[in-house]
Amino acid sequence: MKAQDLREKSVEELNAELMNLLREQFNLRMQAATGQLQQTHTLKAVRRDIARVKTVLTEKAGA
């Protein structure tokens, strides 16, 4: 997910994307805790995607 793509979305779409990412992060954390997660790099990728969405939301709030 690129920040450029996120900047083209509306605030409502960004909030929906953020909620989906937070749900996905929760599920991945639970899988990691129970030892079921094979691709541990996805945790880092989702965390950074969440940060990107939050950054764009903050930019839009200030503009």
From Swiss-Prot:
Pfam families tied to this protein: Ribosomal_L29
InterPro entries: Ribosomal_protein_uL29, Ribosomal_uL29, Ribosomal_uL29_CS, Ribosomal_uL29_sf
Species for this entry: Vibrio parahaemolyticus serotype O3:K6 (strain RIMD 2210633)
GO CC terms, sorted: cytosolic large ribosomal subunit
Keywords assigned by UniProt, alphabetized: Ribonucleoprotein, Ribosomal protein
UniProt lineage: Bacteria, Pseudomonadati, Pseudomonadota, Gammaproteobacteria, Vibrionales
Highest rank taxon of the organism: Bacteria
GO molecular function: structural constituent of ribosome
Protein name: Large ribosomal subunit protein uL29
Family: Belongs to the universal ribosomal protein uL29 family.
Protein's GO biological process: translation
PANTHER family documented for this protein: 60S RIBOSOMAL PROTEIN L35/50S RIBOSOMAL PROTEIN L29, LARGE RIBOSOMAL SUBUNIT PROTEIN UL29C
